[in-house]
Amino acid sequence: MDNFLALTLSGTTPRVTQGKGAGFRWRWLGHGLLELTPDAPVDRALILSAGIHGNETAPVEMLDRLLSALFSGSLTLTWRVLVVLGNPQALAAGIRYCHSDMNRMFGGRWQSFAESDETRRARELELSLETFFSSGQARVRWHLDLHTAIRGSHHLRFGVLPQRDRPWETDFLAWLGAAGLEALVFHQAPGGTFTHFSSEHFGALSCTLELGKALPFGQNDLTQFNVTSQALSALLSGVETSTSSSPPLRYRVVSQITRHSDKFALYMDVQTLNFTVFAKGTLLAEEGDKRVTVTHDVEYVLFPNPSVACGLRAGLMLERLP
């Protein structure tokens, strides 16, 4: 199985759907779904996903390289792994999504969207995770969902962690720092993301890794993500990574800006970077007679997007944690 990405993009099913790798067994579970199981018993299970948005190609290329290293035998596998390329049709078309944003659909939220390939795919991925986690006895469950951002950022690499009722494990947060993440953003409310689904339903330690800016296939400079690729390689092979000398800055979400109608106006231009700072009282958005302003001394914006569909998030406002 040395052509997983090509088969996924072409919509082709391989003639052989299971086999042996270097110290592991593999199974093709469907387009964009590949299960890897070490020959030796392990108690760790990992979801490695990318391509939930079809225009975010750098993480897909990173996963393709990791798979090549595993199948060539240059990288040892010490986890049960489910590799997920989330939205094959959008990846093949080079667009963010074909109908609706899949990363708002998980946890059954796909039922509130008009039926489409993306709603069906979200349901398929939910079932795939359920099958994967229920078929093993993993003591440790991780989910790393790799993305790139639409906009540039004051932090080139950062992580977004779902709302969680229990404390985050220190080794997981330390690994995120070792993977080169410059900032971690902690959600305070449930959401429809893939990582919130895996965390809420299966107790996985989950993080959305934002790695640079969205570019087409072949135009990514993967060298700027070497530290992340090296950390992923070390993780898969069971090698402990050194702790980052500069731990990631930490932020938490304090409010969400939502577009409800065509009257919505977001007062941020296309040059506004993620983590741009705004002072207390700054007018951020208006919609009819509703005004959205900064309520803390300073707040930072994440994912500003004035052109989202009505009812969806147009931005998150953050505060820095000590």
UniProtKB/Swiss-Prot annotation:
Its UniProt pathway annotation is: Amino-acid degradation; L-arginine degradation via AST pathway; L-glutamate and succinate from L-arginine: step 5/5
How is the cofactor bound, in the record's words?
Binds 1 zinc ion per subunit.
Top-tier EC class: hydrolase
Catalytic-site annotation from UniProt: E210
EC number(s) of the enzyme?
3.5.1.96
Residue positions annotated to bind Zn(2+) are H53, E56, H147
Cofactor(s) needed, names only, are: Zn(2+)
Q: A single GO molecular function, which one?
A: succinylglutamate desuccinylase activity
Q: Which Gene3D superfamilies did the record assign? A: Zn peptidases
The record's keywords, sorted A to Z, are: Arginine metabolism, Hydrolase, Metal-binding, Zinc
Q: Does the keyword Hydrolase apply?
A: yes
Q: Which Pfam families match?
A: AstE_AspA_cat, AstE_AspA_hybrid
Query: Catalytic activity annotated for this protein?
Result: N-succinyl-L-glutamate + H2O = L-glutamate + succinate
Q: Which GO terms describe its biological process?
A: arginine catabolic process to glutamate; arginine catabolic process to succinate
Q: What does this protein do?
A: Transforms N(2)-succinylglutamate into succinate and glutamate.
Give the family per the record.
Answer: Belongs to the AspA/AstE family. Succinylglutamate desuccinylase subfamily.
Q: What's the protein here called?
A: Succinylglutamate desuccinylase
